[in-house]
Amino acid sequence: MKERKLLWQGLVALALIPCVLLIYLTGRRVRLPYADEMESAARLHGQVVAAVKAERLRRGYELVPEDRLALGLMGNQISAITTSLGSEEAKRTSQLSDFAALAVRYLHEAGVRPGDRIGACFSASFPGVDLAVLCAAEIMGLDIEYSVSIGSSNYGANLPGYVLPEMILTANRAGLLSTLPQLITMGGDGDAGENMMAYMLEDEEDIREIEEMQARLNEEGLFLTHYSQGFEADVLDRMARMGDIAAFVNVGGNILGMGDTDAAVNFGQGLMAPADPRIGPKSGLVERYLSLGVPVIHLLNIKQLCAETGIPYDPVTLPEPGISGVYYHRDYSRLAIGLVFAGAAIAILAIQLLSRQKREA
């Protein structure tokens, strides 16, 4: 009798497979209600990237061979300010304007509204995503208080003669972005550039290049902040500078954003689910804002973000704004879902009834 019951249960389970498939196939791809805003952010991002590319070329930096899309945000594999390893494919993908659309989507899903203040922590490892968040804030009419770091992994914004704060300044002077960074740090270990290649290799020429970069930034009014209060105090100072915020965005792996432990990695990507992490002296901004109930958007694992949102990963050609899956959600037939659940319920009740009749017989 037990074997017969298991057989019936197995048959019901098998019957449900095509039913679930039917639900998926009858689902419709529906454009998100704020897709026009997403598309506007993506088009602004395209303008910003074009301005940055033009300034990069003006400064004598040719595009790297790895930049197949010729967008101009990819740096060298290694430079004086390189701090860590990075994926060529991820860096190439992170230049796409779809990430500006994604930032708008996540901010809407986080409940952010025009006029709200948001905070952000940007690593130079993903300049395209940093600029994408700024474009989203610009289009949505948000007040954004943010910090940028200079150290970068492979193929990020690691050209000492044209670093991330200067890219933002280029867009600002072109009238494309209205808000400059509130805080600029060296990034890398200790948020002080301790693991930059120039210092690790004790290369005098590269160190001199960094010193020239620092002097140039000061001349441009992009002043570096050198923290020395200790990690926890530095994080709390960063939070105080941002004030009350409706959401926090972390791009890349800056130590103050991620914390001086591996804990933040466990909370996932994109718009994070509410969590209550245990806060300690080494907790970064991601954990601390999660603990306060502030929505956190974490943009680091580019491949995973693409898989989850429909942005093409490492495409051969540049996608047009408004086309990719990030602008859509799937709407499933309520009738089909209802029929499947009703059928499953009837089948389960039938199995129970047959089993009871067998026992009574």
Language model: regions and residue ranges:
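Hydrophobic membrane-insertion alpha-helices, especially the h-region
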Residues: 9-26, 343-346
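N-terminal, Lys/Arg-enriched amphipathic/low-complexity engagement segments
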Residues: 39-96
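Short Gly/Thr/Asp-enriched flexible loops that form oxyanion-binding sites at enzyme active sites
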Residues: 129-136, 259-267
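A substrate-binding/cap region within the structured catalytic cores of diverse enzymes
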Residues: 162-248
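C-terminal functional extensions of proteins
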Residues: 247, 254, 261-361
